[in-house]
């Protein structure tokens, strides 16, 4: 899905999680377009895969796409919009991709939700403004990661209620997604 940028309109590139371009992400793209943003919502899967099972989706993502290909694909989209204000909006692995690209000097901002793998890339120093939102996770100390991130220039990290993957698994009108959409709009309108 792509809406055309006009003038200096901010371009929002939504980077999906391992489940692919879910119905909720399509609805988010429509919502952001109605708010005046140009939106790009690419599928990183060559077959347009949308998965309902997290574990199967995870295996498919890492066997067919992987972080490096995702970085190249999103990097190509960034290059297509040079001169525009560009924001990356990522979920899970998409948040990690947004984080990894936040220091490239080519984007204005990045927003990430439940990007748990960001903890493996704390050496990144963003040149863009970055807002990161984490949910509690069993596999690592989220609060320690948030503290490390908040010590960096241009980064705001926070713990929000919810579970990893809520944007794909909750109803679009749920309080969690409505809260996330408010956070997204606040970041994009800054």
Where are these regions (language model features)?
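Acidic beta-to-alpha connecting loop that harbors the catalytic carboxylate
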Residues: 136-139, 162-163
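C-terminal catalytic histidine-bearing segment of alpha/beta-hydrolase fold enzymes
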Residues: 155-190
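Serine-hydrolase catalytic machinery in alpha/beta-hydrolase-like enzymes
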Residues: 1-82
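Gly/Ala-rich beta-loop-alpha elbow adjacent to hydrolase catalytic centers
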Residues: 89-94, 98
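Short alpha-helix in the alpha/beta-hydrolase fold that links the catalytic acid
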Residues: 28, 140-149
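A conserved short beta-strand
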Residues: 106-117
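Short beta-strand/loop motif that positions the catalytic acidic residue
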Residues: 126, 131-134
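Short beta-to-alpha linker loops that shape the active-site pocket of alpha/beta-hydrolase fold enzymes
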Residues: 43-47, 116, 163
């Amino acid at each position: 899905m792509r809406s055309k940028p006009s003038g200096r309109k901010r371009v929002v590139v939504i980077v999906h999680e391992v489940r692919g371009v879910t119905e909720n992400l399509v609805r988010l793209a429509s919502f952001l377009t109605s708010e005046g943003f140009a939106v790009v919502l690419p599928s990183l899967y060559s077959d347009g895969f949308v998965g309902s099972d997290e574990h199967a989706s995870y295996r498919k993502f890492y066997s067919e796409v992987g972080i490096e290909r995702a970085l190249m694909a999103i990097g190509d989209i960034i290059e297509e919009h040079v001169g525009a204000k560009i924001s990356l909006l990522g979920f899970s692995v998409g948040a990690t991709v947004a984080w990894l690209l936040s220091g490239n000097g080519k984007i204005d901002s990045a927003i990430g939700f439940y990007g748990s793998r960001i903890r493996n890339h704390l050496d990144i120093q963003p040149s863009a403004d970055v807002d990161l939102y984490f949910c509690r996770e069993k596999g690592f100390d989220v609060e320690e990661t948030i503290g490390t991130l908040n010590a960096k220039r241009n980064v705001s990290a926070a713990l929000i209620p919810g579970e990893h993957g809520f944007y794909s698994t909750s109803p679009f009108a749920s309080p969690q997604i409505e809260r996330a959409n408010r956070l997204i709009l606040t970041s994009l309108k800054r």
